[in-house]
Amino acid sequence: MEVPPPFSPSRSPPNPSPALSVGRSTLCTSVISLAAPRAVASLPAALCAVRLGGSVVRAAAVKVTLTGTAAAAAMAEDIRTKLEHYKTAPFDSRFPNQNQTRNCWQNYLDFHRCEKAMAAKGADATPCQWYYRVYKSICPTSWVTTWDEYREEGTFPGKI
Amino acid sequence: MANHSQLGFQDASSPIMEELVEFHDHALMVALAICSLVLYLLTLMLMEKLSSNTVDAQEVELIWTILPAIVLVLLALPSLQILYMMDEIDEPDLTLKAIGHQWYWTYEYTDFKDLSFDSYMTPTTDLPLGHFRLLEVDHRIVIPMESPIRVIITADDVLHSWAVPALGVKTDAIPGRLNQTSFITTRPGVFYGQCSEICGANHSYMPIVVESTPLKHFEAWSSLLSS
């Protein structure tokens, strides 16, 4: 079973895995990914808790089906729209506090992991651009340059 | 900016700072009331008007327990309200990165293009007439007014602190850490601040200047910067 790259359970998560459809709600994706980030393809169904207007509302059970290109195309369109309307990195509920160091690090890792996974599958790497835009917004340029050098040398401390 | 011998806050230019100024006024009133009461009681005591033969003081004990509790509640409630208000999530329109060095700031705007510049203090010998000594910089931060701005603050070498009193912002710049703060400017203007964490010989000479302008002027400025 192929392992989909980790995706962000933030408010607008792109799902780079083309084999997974979770209906229309991208917010539901967050809960599913939190439940089983590495085994999403085998998840039969999930209750999706979404936050609406400050209160947690249980949405209907979301049927997770393995679909092909139609869902992938819809997902790609979603991410393209999100990228077109990108202003700056949105609030990420995984990092709600003052310390955003991990936010920068995680998005940098996610981008490179996504690119690597997409290249391995021969799939379109456009959804990975979300992580790129976010880390570009948050990470200091000098940090990114240093990490890029480490990756080239093979001494990068993160797992990509 | 602050004028010489200024005692009070600078005019608030962000909603949070407005709240902080109001809270300070309120806290100062509470402090004035307590000090007046204490002074009054002290005077009475010195004039020997408070002597008593009683050994049972239940009533007065009750009063000077309940009254301070009420005072504390009067201080805590608005304080916590502002604390939570500061943490409210407001999706920012722009992310600005401020990196502290010895002894200047680097600012980066990388949401779209890679815009980056250094900001050094204007030396007094080069200061044009009418400009503010030790506060002016060669390149100011320009931001659109009335827009939520996220600032990510870090440092390259030692501890610094990015502070702009008129906006109610002060956040430490720590090497290896990204500290996030945010603000909205309620009006256009130029707001000054100074490094607020001792960082070596020229700690007093690395000021911060934020220029808040309408969006179209900000866009014009950023186009100039990127060209």
UniProtKB/Swiss-Prot annotation, chain B:
One GO term (biological process): ATP synthesis coupled electron transport
Provenance organism: Gallus gallus
Localisation: Mitochondrion inner membrane
Mitochondrial intermembrane compartment residues: 1-14, 87-227
Gene transcribed to yield this protein: MT-CO2
Name the UniProt record assigns to this protein: Cytochrome c oxidase subunit 2
Main location: mitochondrion
Entry EC no(s): 7.1.1.9
Subunit structure: Component of the cytochrome c oxidase (complex IV, CIV), a multisubunit enzyme composed of 14 subunits. The complex is composed of a catalytic core of 3 subunits MT-CO1, MT-CO2 and MT-CO3, encoded in the mitochondrial DNA, and 11 supernumerary subunits COX4I, COX5A, COX5B, COX6A, COX6B, COX6C, COX7A, COX7B, COX7C, COX8 and NDUFA4, which are encoded in the nuclear genome.
Catalytic reactions on record: 4 Fe(II)-[cytochrome c] + O2 + 8 H(+)(in) = 4 Fe(III)-[cytochrome c] + 2 H2O + 4 H(+)(out)
Disulfide-linked positions: none
